[in-house]
Amino acid sequence: AMLSACEPSVKAPEAILPVPEQKQIDWQKMETYAFVHFGLNTFNDREWGYGDTDPATFNPAKLDCEQWVKTFVAAGMKGVIFTAKHHDGFCLWPTQLTEYCIRNTPYKEGKGDIVGELAAACKKYGIKFAVYLSPWDRHQANYASPEYVDYFHKQLRELMTNYGEVFEVWFDGANGGDGWYGGAKDTRTIDRKNYYNYPKIYEMLDELQPQAIVFSDGGPGCRWVGNEAGFAGATNWSFLRAGEVFPGYAK
């Protein structure tokens, strides 16, 4: 036994596949967290809003974000993602970039900020907070133009600087199609790989929220499994082709 204890330790083998970043390991250890999909559509029986729904229809008078978070904690969840803006373009924080937001609703007489209320509740009860921000915007007249990309980046910067630490940023892969677009009511297409300038977005996130995992069907932190049934490959479910795949461009 003493001889075996004196034997030199065996060097660990070199990695033959990409190894995860520490923040990816930390994300895996979270195990289970909630996703709250809430907004104008909640009050208008829609899954995807067209971009023309009247903000006056949004008035969750009895909303209590602390009640939400206490429920998540009781269920053993370690965080929550919230839809700050879905494809309809309606913003659940009082953004300074568009009037199509919570400031122009009856909720708290235009003084509400559900992104802020939920972030504060998460901090109070000790769970992590994250945001979903749809790149596609069926409300904005300038969607599919370079001007919209600047608008989208500025929205993301607002969310990343005003609500404390986030553990994840979720970008949806649904991009381009028919929409209200400021009254144009037409169909628009984009170059899904290049339009949003994701390399610049990743630089912003590394600067403002370096601990945050980026989720999309192209990662780069964690990716959509490829279907909505919950099935994944046994050995390669978390591999990503960095620099080749992007949100909305998973080819």
Q: Model-found features: residue ranges?
A:
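C-terminal motif of bacterial Sec signal peptides marking the signal peptidase cleavage site
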Residues: 3-5
